[in-house]
A protein has these predicted regions:
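A short glycine-rich, Lys/Arg-flanked "PGG" loop and its adjoining helix->strand segment in the class I
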Residues: 118-133
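A short His-aromatic
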Residues: 110-112
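Hydrophobic/aromatic residues located in beta-strands of well-ordered beta-sheets
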Residues: 63, 134-136
Length: 282
């Protein structure tokens, strides 16, 4: 009996369901075009609909997509783009050594265990010619929005990969000039939209000099003993007011520092969703 559950095209259908579209993909992927400016032949591993392949072709680059999703392959062929419907690792293992100028892969490595990622990078190094470049884009582990939202949206995600870890893998298999960074194109309004600069609460400092000085009318004053108690009480209250003034001043200073502290915190965690690692084969 055949399995009634058909998972063919599941990834493609999911991306359409969540609203991923060509316009957004082109905007996000355009950031990586300068890395391949001097390349003649570039392969996009896990190319999906082929939006980056299309961008490369428009730049005069001989671009090829590789994706195991048959529906994505059909869509690419319908657009007149070159596609090999094959697993990315299998493709790299079989392609002629030193035949590629560039390799690009966006949001593939997070679907793989680290052993497979290392294999992918190893065979990518083999496939590239001297001076060839590789770029690997993946969810940004520095971004809070990745951990709280976007990373968990896809059923196939296996692990975050810190770009420095990817750089280590790249270096270990023989790549050099490895660097990493963030792609600012994808929107990431997680904390920025929730936090607005607000002036700190204004509490008037208590200035003892503004208290009105009044003379005591001795003829109409209460008995001396009562007056003495009243004077002691007044001194105590003034002492407390003076101490409160210092507290209010300190609180105001802390409130004044709060926006800068919040900006620093937001800058550290409200990062772009996508990061990348890149390197060159010597």
């Amino acid at each position: 009996m055949s399995d009634p559950i058909d998972l063919t095209g599941l990834d493609y259908d999911y991306l359409r369901y969540t609203g991923v579209n060509a316009a957004d993909q082109r905007k996000n992927h355009s950031f990586y075009l300068p890395f391949f400016r001097d390349c003649r032949r570039v392969v996009d591993l896990g190319c999906g609909d082929g939006d980056f392949v299309q961008l490369l072709v428009e730049q005069g680059v001989e671009a090829l997509g590789v994706d195991s999703d048959p529906i994505a392959a059909e869509k690419m062929r319908a657009r007149g783009l070159s596609i090999i419907a094959e697993d990315a690792l299998t493709y790299l293992q079989n392609v002629e050594a030193g035949s590629l100028d560039g390799i690009f892969s966006a949001h593939l490595v997070e679907h793989l265990r680290y052993q497979a990622v290392y294999q992918l990078i190893f065979y990518a190094n083999r496939a590239l010619k001297s001076g060839g470049r590789i770029v690997l884009a993946t969810p940004n582990p520095h971004a809070l929005i990745s951990h709280l939202d976007l990373y968990w949206l896809h059923f196939g995600h296996v692990s975050f990969y810190h770009p420095r870890l990817l750089c280590f893998f790249l270096h270990r298999v023989g790549f050099r000039s490895e660097t990493w960074g963030e792609n600012p194109a994808p929107p990431h309004p997680l904390l920025g939209s929730l936090y607005h600069h607000q002036a700190p609460p204004q509490a008037n400092s208590i200035d003892p000099g503004r208290f009105e000085r009044r003379s005591i009318d001795w003829e109409a004053s209460p008995p001396r003993e009562k007056l003495s108690r009243w004077r002691r009480s007044l001194r105590g209250r003034l002492a407390r007011l003076l101490g409160l003034d210092d507290i209010v001043r300190q609180v105001n200073q802390e409130f004044a520092q709060l926006p800068a502290d919040m900006d620093s915190l937001i800058d550290r965690v409200d990062r772009p969703f996508e990061c990348f690692a890149t390197a060159v084969k010597p």
